[in-house]
Amino acid sequence: MGHSEEMIQKAIAQENGKVHVNAQSIPEKYQQKRADEAGVIEHIRYPSKDYFLAGKEITKEANVYLPYGYSRDKKYNVLYLMHGIGGDEAEWGMVDEDSLVKRMMDNLIYYKEIEPFIVVTPNGRSTENCAREGSDYNSFYVFGKELRSDLIPYMEAHYSTYAVEGDPSASRMHRAMAGLSMGGMQTINIGIGECMDLFSYFGAFSAAPTSNLAEKTAKILEDTPYTVDYFYNICGTEDEIAYDSAAAAAKNLPALCDKLKESDNFIWQELKGMHDFHIWYLGFFNFAQIAFKSVSYTHLRAHETGRNL
């Protein structure tokens, strides 16, 4: 669907490059591994189908961050965090105690910047062969079926969330979707494009070139009865892969859609940077502080709660 092999390989190479996160972007105290009050990462396997091919029953894998003190006696918001075209459920690093996503979450919670919530990193390819290499990239585009029919129901059956039985839309304000590159495309095309009844918070980090154009997203938002609590975007100005597409997908949305208002429930953040984790970790750090704020901190305006915006 519009991918050139050269662009794909370039995106994969940049995704897999080693990154030293700049402490000026994400304060050092949020990057530290906590010796106390630390959450845990669980690895899950859940039943699904090969939605790209013949609908064969398969098993998919994902990683789940549970905040410190997680209890079945409490209810938690859930962020579904998507990877890029060269990654899988492990690309965000949520595989062990050294995960930067985990460290940021642990510290944001410890310093009371956010209320505790769950983070899920699934494999965004909805097909049996969902490996980093050798899989069909078009399987990214049917992930919405797996998300709706398999992953969200599994999470809500096995973890303590705000799920309302028989009515997923009743708890949409307790779910968020975000992702890097191809995962940013999935957030726009699938999260907003197909699943507004399931989510109300969205984050696109360097959204991929096949993301819906702003005009299409604006029409979707105008036609849906659901509102957007927040749509956060970030992209590097030196990103040769995604800057033009990400800007075309989101930058002018408030001018096209009455449901999005700059600094109220929408932000476009661009800064010097390329198509890599310098941008994406900062995107996660910022979005983690924006998501669920109207739920957890109703007395604060969303634009007052972000960092480095």
What are these model-predicted stretches?
Residues 299-302, 306-309:
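Single conserved hydrophobic/aromatic residue that forms the stacking wall/gate
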Residues 1-301:
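Non-catalytic cap/lid and distal C-terminal segments of serine-dependent acyl enzymes
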